[in-house]
């Protein structure tokens, strides 16, 4: 389970409540079938990895891994076995006799994860553990932590993992299920696929995905029995499926939502459902371009493969182009509740 959201949404506070580091104001905290409200952190069967991993500088990697087990008075042979097992999983075998100052950032973070593994907890709690690493190391560690979770499952000693991050890439690539939070409230708990394709509200729709979803105010207008989106001074008819989902909402203020990859752009009008805008700027991502169109009083982002975009871009900016939406991928949100009324 990954908890994701912007800074200040209470995701780390939620994790600390699970760990027993933060007092809850009401309700129950359960780990498995056990209510743990009144249990100290060490009695909850959890292991936590923080953003600042704080290894003991005067101890070797081996000693850092073993320290918590020694405090619990575990037999020496068992400590050695569990340290060696964790070192093997995280590929730390060659580093066991090094001091923290002799480690790279990624290696030090693996040791911090190893200290959690050796405890063999019921629950792993990760609080933004990769925030201090550069982009390349973050990608590598994401894979390692995901692989660790799978290995523990296969070993017959599975542990629930709760992972907190503000990075949606980490959330989408690591989570079996993701909890999206805003200002202390849960906005949606779902699979990565459902969060992306079936967001329950405008916040989730705009938070998940990069570049973010185009979400703009619109009116649903009736055109000879078929509803259409009002876009500037033009309209774009809904698909039959979308029409059936939102029929009856014509009188409401609404927003449409469309991801940039479901916006098509052309120099010529499309056969059906075409609107126009001004091509104002582009961003070259190598294999694709982000094309920004000025439509009425806002910008619309389109994500277009390079071979399609290049001929249009070569004709220059600040000129009229045409666009249409894949209406089977379009969302309609109620302006008052911000809920998705099209799923």
Each model region followed by its residue ranges:
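Conserved coupling/switch loops of ABC nucleotide-binding domains, chiefly the family-specific signature
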Residues: 25-28, 78, 183, 330
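ABC ATPase nucleotide-binding domains
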Residues: 44-45, 55-203
